[in-house]
Swiss-Prot record:
Probable prephenate dehydrogenase that produces 4-hydroxyphenylpyruvate (4HPP) in the novobiocin biosynthesis pathway. Novobiocin is an aminocoumarin family antibiotic that targets bacterial DNA gyrases. It comes from Streptomyces niveus (Streptomyces spheroides). The gene is novF. The lineage of its organism: Bacteria, Bacillati, Actinomycetota, Actinomycetes, Kitasatosporales. InterPro entries: NAD(P)-bd_dom_sf, PDH_N, Preph/Arog_dehydrog, Prephen_DH. This is Probable prephenate dehydrogenase NovF. It is an enzyme of class 1 (oxidoreductase).
Length: 362
């Protein structure tokens, strides 16, 4: 990837621009807000102008309700060869893209799972995505070259790609981010009725609880919640049944004499289920361990164009990358690029890369 356009210069879009510029990618910036655009350019995320010619990739970093119309508009103008969005909802976005007649072969849904206080370009950081999971959601007809370009973007930003389908993505986001945020919001709402003494007592404790969505991001958060309502309802119904069971247990405990005693076995079971569920989440995000993949290692020198040439050759081999890792070799300026593919594709990729004079090994 040599050129990119970032459409939307909030915290995410500007951070992507900073990361791409660090990798030598010529980045152009577009935004409906002249102020945000000037700030993003000033912090070094790219050039605040439309690209003079078709770019390799357009990153659409706009609120969820605008993703499909923006992609449709830029596809009609030929802005980029491929498109990636960063919205937190995928099923409804894909449905809207299809309804607008977009070329889904060139579009890959994306969603970097990051969060930090603040919003807008001044909150951006070039290392925002380092080591963080980044969901990639190709459609059934997505070109291999489009997915490979999206994987290249994720690698350039230092994130870890997780490839899955739209339905699985939305279910995961409902369970792991939206429902916890709803629960936290409901608890926080109870604080409006707490007395001032209780609030003083809870000040430092509450600050250690994961961040409640801020007013600056409330609109986009509610858009994701509304668009993802169906899987959220399903998870809340399960949570409601668990809560009803817990209430029944606690009512039984409350009917006692209030003395300290050994914990009720059902309460221990409740806590243990939470521990067991939390322990299932891998410490390192990436392709699920049950998915068998093969790695192909390629030595790439430090010229900026070489990494782009490698990804172009991988796409030319007709192979879909399922994961990628780039590491610096300690004894030279060269990098080792580890490409994860299916075992069936590994032999073909190795043959094609060697044919194109790449030093590749499996």
């Amino acid at each position: 990837m040599r050129t990119a356009v970032i459409i939307g210069t909030g915290m995410i879009g500007t951070s992507i621009g900073l990361a791409l510029r660090k990798q030598g990618v010529d980045s152009y910036l577009m935004d409906t807000s002249p102020v945000a655009l000037r700030i993003a350019e000033a912090v070094g995320a790219g050039t605040a102008e439309e690209p003079p010619e078709t770019v390799d990739l357009a990153v659409v970093a706009v609120p969820p309700v605008h993703v499909a119309p923006v992609i449709a508009s830029h596809q009609s103008r030929g802005t980029a060869r491929f498109y990636v969005d960063v919205a937190g909802v995928k099923v409804s976005t894909r449905r809207e893209l299809d309804a607008l007649g977009c070329d889904l072969a060139t579009v890959v849904g994306g969603h970097p799972l990051v969060g930090r206080p603040g919003s807008g370009p001044l909150a951006a950081r070039g290392d925002l995505f380092d080591g963080r999971p980044w969901a990639l959601v190709p459609a059934v007809g997505t070109d291999a070259a489009a997915l490979n370009r999206a994987l290249e973007l994720v690698a350039a930003c230092g994130a870890i790609p997780v490839v899955l389908d739209a339905e699985a993505h939305d279910r995961a986001i409902a369970l792991g981010t939206l429902v916890p945020q709803i629960a936290l919001t409901l608890v926080a709402a109870r604080l409006t009725e707490a007395d001032s003494g209780a609030l003083r007592l809870l000040g430092s404790v509450w600050s250690e609880i994961p961040q409640l969505v801020g007013v600056d991001s409330a609109t986009s958060w509610t858009q994701v919640l509304a668009a993802n309502a169906a899987p959220v309802v399903g998870e809340l119904e399960k949570l409601s049944r668990d809560l009803a069971s817990l209430l029944e247990t606690l009512r039984g405990v409350a009917d006692g004499d209030g003395s300290l005693a050994e914990p009720d076995g059902r309460l221990l079971e409740f806590i243990q289920r939470g521990i067991d569920g939390s322990n299932r989440v891998p410490g390192r995000y990436g392709i699920p361990t049950e998915t068998a993949l093969a790695d192909v290692d390629v030595s790439v020198d430090d010229r900026p164009a070489e990494l782009a040439r490698l990804f172009d050759d991988v796409a030319g081999a007709g192979v879909v990358m399922r994961g990628i890792d780039i590491s610096q070799r300690p004894d030279s300026p060269d990098r080792t690029v580890t490409i994860s593919v299916t075992p069936r594709d590994a032999e073909n990729l190795l043959h094609e890369l060697r044919r194109r004079k790449w030093p590749a090994n499996s």
